[in-house]
Amino acid sequence: MAHPHLLAERISRLSSSLEKGLYERSHAIRLCLLAALSGESVFLLGPPGIAKSLIARRLKFAFQNARAFEYLMTRFSTPEEVFGPLSIQALKDEGRYERLTSGYLPEAEIVFLDEIWKAGPAILNTLLTAINERQFRNGAHVEKIPMRLLVAASNELPEADSSLEALYDRMLIRLWLDKVQDKANFRSMLTSQQDENDNPVPASLQVTDEEYERWQKEIGEITLPDHVFELIFMLRQQLDKLPDAPYVSDRRWKKAIRLLQASAFFSGRSAVAPVDLILLKDCLWYDAQSLNLIQQQIDVLMTGHAWQQQGMLTRLGAIVQRHLQLQQQQSDKTALTVIRLGGIFSRRQQYQLPVNVTASTLTLLLQKPLKLHNMEVVHISFERSALEQWLSKGGEIRGKLNGIGFAQKLNLEVDSAQHLVVRDVSLQGSTLALPGSSAEGLPGEIKQQLEELESDWRKQHALFSEQQRCLFIPGDWLGRIEASLQDVGAQIRQAQQC
């Protein structure tokens, strides 16, 4: 058995060879290759002339001595054109109803059926058995068929509540393709002199029959860790709650798990990882609406839960809140004391800020939280100039509650100890205090919790870095996950600097 990382490198090189001369079709080739290597089926949706048939032809070259069958369905197609003509000799001499299958679907490893929804019931029923059981009933005998990949294509989806839904449900991977978009790729496609039917794969990379059979057993040995199952179940529950979510059968979930196992196996891993779950975006949708919905839900799963991003942010919020509580407990020591000005006979007492308070924006902590303007408030941000004017001349004073939003009007006063006191609508008061000096640093309790959180973040980021080397996952998805982890890391580091 090849080393897992050597196998992953080989599959990557095999895919690169198959992709040569095909523009903006890398993802489709890679998923079709994954389907072929795990014995699954693919549905390609898109307008005519966008290389759907060429993708299927290319996949034949992934295997040594693979046979291919390609057919364009019409409403007049007959089973003989797909599964082979009847043997007149057998019928005449022995009275046996038997098909001559050489060169037809029952003896092909790679099958491409275009305009699949135009097939009649006789073809569809036989095709369902071929997909489900890899068997073909030929007269009185049941023969095993060698089909490794079925690629079905159409420029439309099957009608809802039609007899075609059973076949559509067997198409595990569903890809929506479009014309070449990039200008440079479009030019290269127009000027390419490459013969699209040439074999682009070196013999050393092609998969032998023995390797294919061995890999089918080894794919089944890839484990599904508990934390990955929990993510899958979370996705399933979330979809069940959404009124517009597509119906996903238990059969489709089970077949999707084998695809995830194959993704892990051909990426050199012994267990399914969260990154493999991104493949579900190409397995669970039914139509255009559900395609967008599925992608949104998987994006939330990947950027919020798969590497504990949301859990770490929740922990960080609790740590920050605890830090504020500790600061509030020290507020008596750090209560802002203003300086009294003028004589005792002045018509209005005037005050000023201490000379060591020089920041242009002051963040003052409440000794105890108050509900102000329908918000639980633990600190208030003031513009220094506005606070100085209020201390000197009185009038209206405004501040940002918890440092966010617009400045709100406040009921602020100076008590007999020359401390600033803010009051709520019930006149409950809370003394305002300066945050602890930065020189004092974080309390030991908070520092330890932040260090533990940062350590957990580093572990999750390292896990993602190891897992993201997956050929079958688009780079833009990996980029969004990396950004979500970096955002969590930045917030942790910011809290450590407070």
From Swiss-Prot:
SMART domains per record? AAA (SM00382)
Question: Which catalytic reaction applies to this protein?
Answer: ATP + H2O = ADP + phosphate + H(+)
How is this protein's activity controlled?
A: ATPase activity is stimulated by ViaA.
- Source domain of life: Bacteria
Record's subcellular location: Cytoplasm
Give binding positions for ADP.
Y23, G49, I50, A51, K52, S53, L54, E196
InterPro entries (UniProt xref) = AAA+_ATPase (IPR003593), ATPase_RavA (IPR023671), ATPase_RavA_C (IPR022547), MoxR (IPR045427), P-loop_NTPase (IPR027417), RavA-like_AAA_lid (IPR041538), RavA_ATPases (IPR050513), RavA_LARA_dom (IPR046898)
Q: Which Pfam families does the record cross-reference, listed alphabetically? A: AAA_lid_8, ATPase_RavA_C, bpMoxR, LARA_dom
An annotated GO cellular component of this protein is: cytoplasm
EC assignment: the record states 3.6.1.-
UniProt GO molecular function: ATP binding; ATP hydrolysis activity
What are the protein's UniProt keywords? ATP-binding, Chaperone, Cytoplasm, Hydrolase, Nucleotide-binding
Subunit: Homohexamer. Interacts with ViaA.
Q: Which PANTHER family match?
A: ATPASE RAVA
State the protein's purpose. Component of the RavA-ViaA chaperone complex, which may act on the membrane to optimize the function of some of the respiratory chains. RavA functions as an ATPase.
The similarity comment for this entry is:
Belongs to the RavA family.
The protein here is known as: Regulatory ATPase RavA
Per the UniProt record, the source organism is Escherichia coli O157:H7
Gene transcribed to yield this protein: ravA
